Design a protein with these regions (language model features):
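Short alpha-helical segments that sit at the start of domains
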Residues: 1-13, 84-86, 120
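Short, cationic-aromatic polyanion-contact patches
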Residues: 3-7, 23, 57-79
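Short helix-capping/hinge SLiMs at alpha-helix to coil transitions
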Residues: 15-19
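Short acidic, hydrophobic short linear motifs in intrinsically disordered regions
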Residues: 21-30
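Key DNA-contact positions within bacterial/archaeal DNA-binding proteins
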Residues: 36-37
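Short, hydrophobic-biased segments on the C-terminal half of alpha helices
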Residues: 40-47
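A short, conserved structural fragment
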Residues: 47-59
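Amphipathic alpha-helical dimerization/coiled-coil segments
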Residues: 75-120
Length: 120
C-alpha cells in the first residue's frame, strides 16, 4: 500500500473525520489552508488510485459538485501502512504510549482492545 503524503493525507483526514461524503468546496471550507486547486488535484489523484469514490452530487450555489467518500478506512490505512513498513505491534504500541499526547481515556481504550484480543 502506498503511503499517503502531504495534502492527500490531509484531505483523507478531513473525509475520515467528517464521516460523510464531501465536495471539494466543503473540504476547502473545513480546511481552508488547503487551497481549492490543490484540493481538486488531490481528489483526482485519490479517485484515480481508488482510495475514494464519487458518492453522488450536490448543489453548491448554482453549480453541481461531486461528493467524495473514502473507500479506505483510517484503521485499514494505518494497518496496511504499518505492515508495509514492517512495524511490529509492540513498536507501534510503544510509540503510542510514549507520545506526549496520549490521554488516560485513550490508554483505557487500548487496554480494552488488548484484553479483548487476549480473550480471543
Amino acid at each position: 500500500m502506498d503511503i499517503l503524503k502531504g495534502k492527500r493525507y490531509d484531505i483523507m483526514n478531513v473525509l475520515w473525520e467528517e464521516g460523510r461524503p464531501l465536495s471539494a468546496f466543503e473540504i476547502n471550507d473545513i480546511a481552508p489552508e488547503l487551497k481549492m486547486p490543490t484540493v481538486r488535484r488531490c481528489l483526482e489523484l485519490l479517485l484515480k488510485e481508488n482510495i475514494i469514490k464519487v458518492a453522488g452530487t450536490s448543489m453548491n450555489g448554482k453549480v453541481y459538485a461531486r461528493n467524495y467518500t473514502p473507500l479506505l478506512s483510517r484503521e485499514d490505512y494505518l494497518k496496511g501502512n504499518a505492515k508495509s513498513r514492517k512495524i511490529s505491534p509492540v513498536e507501534m504500541m510503544t510509540a503510542l504510549l510514549e507520545s506526549d499526547g496520549i490521554t488516560v481515556e485513550e490508554i483505557e481504550q487500548l487496554q480494552k482492545l488488548l484484553n479483548k484480543k487476549r480473550a480471543e
